[in-house]
Amino acid sequence: MQSTTFTRLLAAAALAATTLFAPATQAQGAQQYVNINPPMPSDTPGKIEVLEFFAYTCPHCAAIEPMVEDWAKTAPQDVVLKQVPIAFNAGMKPLQQLYYTLQALERPDLHPKVFTAIHTERKRLFDKKAMGEWAASQGVDRAKFDSVFDSFSVQTQVQRASQLAEAAHIDGTPAFAVGGRYMTSPVLAGNDYAGALKVVDQLIVQSRK
């Protein structure tokens, strides 16, 4: 039986997914992106940033993740992909911390495995204890995990992620901000995961102009 917290968080994720497929911001006509106003400054000078906004509880993010991984392998040299975990409620903040903790511990390989754990294996990774136990089962030192999870660095990155989501006017996941000027998503691309990445490619070209 699912715990009340587990059910509540999955319900929140489902709501976020519904929001994606009925976004508050609508593209005009056949346009498959919206302008970000005001534009977002880049954290990587000389590069075109592609920000992927995601939530581990989002089933659409889980579905598109392998495609994003493949896309990143062939991205142009002047493009940098940054994945940005966001929270639609306070209960999802630990999942933001989980992402940045795994990055700090140099275990980016566990990123797709978190999606599998939550959506396929139905693991309740919604608090530090459960996350720490799962990470330890994947070969992560538990003491280091606990220390980094609550570190100032991780807290700062979580805060920055929330600021980026607000600046890009993200109201559903997954979504992509390109060059700080444009935002697209599967819904804007016709409810098409692959189509969204094609739009990202087009926006990269547009960002160079």
UniProtKB/Swiss-Prot annotation:
Disulfide bonds join C58-C61. Residues 28-166 form the Thioredoxin domain. Residues 1-27 form the signal peptide. Its main location: periplasm. GO terms for cellular component: periplasmic space. Transmembrane segments: none annotated. It is found in: Periplasm. One of its GO terms (molecular function) is disulfide oxidoreductase activity. Keywords: Disulfide bond, Periplasm, Redox-active center, Signal. CDD domains: DsbA_DsbA (cd03019). The keyword Signal applies. Belongs to the thioredoxin family. DsbA subfamily. Involved in disulfide-bond formation. Acts by transferring its disulfide bond to other proteins. This is Thiol:disulfide interchange protein DsbA. It comes from Bordetella parapertussis (strain 12822 / ATCC BAA-587 / NCTC 13253).
